[in-house]
Structures are given as C-alpha cells and as structure tokens.
C-alpha cells in the first residue's frame, strides 16, 4: 500500500488536513468501500488545456487505484461565473455556450482518464429546482467573515471595487456539490483551495464527514509567469494540433522546464529525476524541451504525430538541414573535463548508466571518430567535438 500512497501523494501542493488521505484510505478499508473522488469544472471555455490536465492526472491516479470518480460539470454555477483570481466581475455565459462547452469538456476528459467508469454529474440537477427556502438555509451555513477571507474578495473590497452578492455565494454553491455527492476527497488547483474548503465546511454543517482537500500546483503558461489560462492566451490546448502543441512547448522559458517535465508529461519518475540531474550537469535545455514536447504530443496525439511534429519544428522553425538535425547540441562548460560515462549520460539521460556502460565497453561510442571504450576516461570539453553513441545518436558540443 505504501507505493500506492506515494503515487497518490506525488506532485501535490497542499493537502488539508495534512494526513487526511491516509485517514480516508484507512476508513475506506474499514468500511470496505471505495473513496468518492470529486473534481469539478465550470464549462467557461470550449477547451481544456495542460493546466487542467495536471489535476486530471491526479484524478487518474485515484482512478487507477479503483476509487469512485465523480466529475461535476458546473453548468449551473457557470451561469454565475467563478470569481477566483479575478479583480473584476466575470461575465456569465449563456445556456447555449454552457451546453456546448460541457459536451466538449466531456470529450476531452477522455484524453487523460477513462471516461467509461466515471460518473459525470451536472450541478443543475440539484440547483435548478431548489426551493428558495433551501437556498437561505444553505447560505446560512457560511458567514460573511469567512467569505471575505478570500484574497480576491478582500483585494476588491479594500480597493472599493464592486463585489456582487452572486459572486459571494459562488463558493457556497460549489461547496454544496460536495454535500450532494458525499465526496471523500476533492481535487483542484491551488487557486481552488478556499472553494474546496468551503465544501468541507458545508459537509460538516450538514452532519456529514468532511472531505479531504488536495490541490495541485498551477502550471505556468507560455509566458512562464502567470498560470496557464485561456483568457490570458498563454495556454496549450488539449485539442491543439500536433505541430502547434509541439511548437508551443518549445517556446516556454527555460525557468519552467522542470515544472513542465514533472506536471505535464507522463514520464516515469525515475526518468524525470535523471533528466533533472542531467539538466543540472549542463544538458542543453533545447534537448530537454524537445523530449518534453515529444512526450506531450505523443500523449495527446500519437507517436507518429510526435515524430512528424519534431521534424516540422526542426525544418520550419529551426531551419535545420537533415544533416544538421542529426546532431543534437550539448552545452557544457568550455575547457572542463567530463568522464566518458558522464558525457554519455548527459547526452542520453533517459538511458540507464548500466546500459551506457555496456555501449561504451562494446565499442559503440566514438569521440571525433575515435572509438572510446574506457568509461572513466576524461574527455576535454571542446566546442565542435562530435560524439556518436551507437548508430542512432549523434551529438556536437556547442560553443
């Protein structure tokens, strides 16, 4: 069970309460039942993006462990507009927009999770016909002081910007979804922490067991600064074509490479760690970005599309000839020395060191056309030096 917990805890930003997952898992075993895992979306835009996929991947982790997955489509609350992170009123959507976006969301969920064994609920089920007396009863469970703890409301209030009453009740309505489905755990981005904690408070107010709140880090957008968002036009959509998806990943700043590696790819943790180590040793960030871009395109399209997108990027964007494209560039400290094994490991971080040793000892590694079979030999870092590893991999030390 420890390995399963490690997987479920991987990459999370905040869990409230801190040991809540372990307690919920123990309770589920005691009661011989699955946990109910909730993830909610307001269909405010037609496309999901890689930022949404960070949370969807965590949902898949729980799905893989056999738990009950409930996705809430906030078709009712989308008509209000989530004020999270807003410094002004979010415009509500029309019923037509909401219905259209809801369907595209459901289709796109299948790119990350298995939609055959999840429950999809719309919160209009319980809100459309809720008597007004029940609305009053619901909002009486939360105080204005609690609501005003939200940073976005507090900022707007202090700057005398308007805060509308329908925005104030939004977190309460979203939280009530957890009451209706008896959620054990709610997932979301860190920007949803307040809303999700309201759900926990409401469950307890209705004499139910409070849900655990797990939030995931927010993936930076293409600018490398603000969170990925369609409204900021800094996003990579799950439905982007392969060439656009690849090119957008290649455009990210070097400062967010590791976040994209850990949050947006489905590489094994061991491979991710190896790449991070090699990046620290001086592997060209361009090489890392290509690995990330390839993985992401393969994940949301297929392997052939990823290969074609790579070729398109090198031919059209980098304007490299086929011969130049054969040699990836390694950036290492000029004039320094590095062992042959470390050099090969920097060049090919995804290949294990034991496999690289085998290649070296078998005579499959050449440095400037000279066969090298001593893994501990120190190689001087000289710009322009060519390295061949096997028949497939060719590298050039950059200046």
Swiss-Prot record:
**Assigned keywords, A-Z:** Aminoacyl-tRNA synthetase, ATP-binding, Cytoplasm, Ligase, Nucleotide-binding, Protein biosynthesis, RNA-binding
Question: Which Pfam families does this entry report, sorted A to Z?
Answer: S4 (PF01479), tRNA-synt_1b (PF00579)
What are the binding positions for ATP in this chain?
Answer: 230
Q: Name one GO molecular function term.
A: ATP binding
Q: Subcellular location, in the record's words? A: Cytoplasm
Q: What is one GO cellular-component annotation here?
A: cytosol
Q: What class of enzyme is it?
A: ligase
Might you give the EC number(s) for this enzyme? Answer: 6.1.1.1
Q: Which reaction does it catalyse?
A: tRNA(Tyr) + L-tyrosine + ATP = L-tyrosyl-tRNA(Tyr) + AMP + diphosphate + H(+)
Q: Which terms under GO biological process does the entry name?
A: tyrosyl-tRNA aminoacylation
Q: Where is this motif: 'KMSKS' region?
A: 227-231
Keyword Cell membrane in annotation: no
Domain S4 RNA-binding stretches: 338-398
PROSITE patterns from the xrefs? AA_TRNA_LIGASE_I (PS00178), S4 (PS50889)
Record's keyword annotation contains Ligase = yes
Instruction: Tell me the NCBIfam families matching this sequence.
Output: tyrS (TIGR00234)
Could you tell me what this protein does? Catalyzes the attachment of tyrosine to tRNA(Tyr) in a two-step reaction: tyrosine is first activated by ATP to form Tyr-AMP and then transferred to the acceptor end of tRNA(Tyr).
Family, according to the entry, reads as follows: Belongs to the class-I aminoacyl-tRNA synthetase family. TyrS type 2 subfamily.
The protein's name in its UniProt record = Tyrosine--tRNA ligase 2
């Amino acid at each position: 069970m420890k390995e399963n917990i490690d997987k479920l805890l991987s990459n999370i930003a905040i869990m409230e309460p801190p040991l809540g997952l372990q307690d919920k898992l123990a309770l589920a075993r005691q009661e011989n039942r699955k946990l109910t895992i909730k993830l909610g979306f307001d269909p405010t835009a037609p496309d999901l993006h890689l930022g949404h996929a960070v949370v969807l991947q965590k949902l898949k982790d729980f799905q893989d462990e056999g738990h009950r997955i409930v996705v809430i489509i906030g078709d009712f609350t989308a008509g209000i507009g989530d004020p999270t992170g807003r410094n002004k009123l979010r415009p509500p959507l029309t019923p037509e927009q909401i219905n259209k976006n809801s369907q595209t969301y459901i289709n796109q969920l299948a790119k990350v999770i298995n939609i055959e064994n999840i429950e999809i609920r719309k919160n209009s089920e319980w809100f459309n016909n809720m008597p007004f007396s029940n609305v009053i009863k619901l909002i009486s469970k939360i105080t204005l002081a609690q609501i005003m703890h939200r940073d976005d409301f507090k900022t707007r209030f202090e700057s005398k910007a308007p805060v509308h009453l329908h925005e104030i009740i939004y977190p309460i309505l979203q939280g009530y979804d957890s009451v209706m489905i008896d959620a054990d755990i709610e997932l979301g981005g860190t920007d949803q922490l307040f809303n999700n904690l309201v759900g926990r408070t409401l469950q307890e107010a209705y004499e139910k067991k409070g849900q655990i709140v797990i939030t995931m880090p927010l993936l930076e957008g293409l600018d490398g600064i603000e969170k990925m968002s369609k409204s900021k036009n800094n996003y990579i959509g799950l439905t982007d074509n392969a060439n656009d998806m690849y090119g957008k990943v290649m455009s990210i700043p070097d400062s967010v490479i590791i976040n994209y590696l850990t949050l947006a790819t489905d590489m094994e943790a061991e491979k991710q760690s190896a790449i991070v180590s090699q990046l620290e040793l001086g592997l060209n960030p361009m090489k890392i970005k290509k690995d990330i871009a390839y993985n992401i395109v393969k994940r949301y399209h297929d392997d052939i599309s990823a290969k074609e997108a790579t070729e398109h990027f090198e031919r059209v964007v980098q304007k490299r000839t086929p011969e130049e494209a054969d040699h990836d560039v390694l950036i290492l400290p000029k004039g320094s020395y590095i062992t042959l094994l470390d050099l090969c490991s920097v060049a090919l971080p995804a290949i294990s060191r034991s496999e690289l040793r085998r290649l070296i000892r078998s005579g499959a590694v050449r440095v400037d056309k000279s066969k090298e079979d001593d893994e501990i030999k120190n190689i001087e870092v000289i710009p322009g030096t060519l390295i061949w590893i096997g028949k497939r991999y060719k590298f050039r030390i950059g200046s």
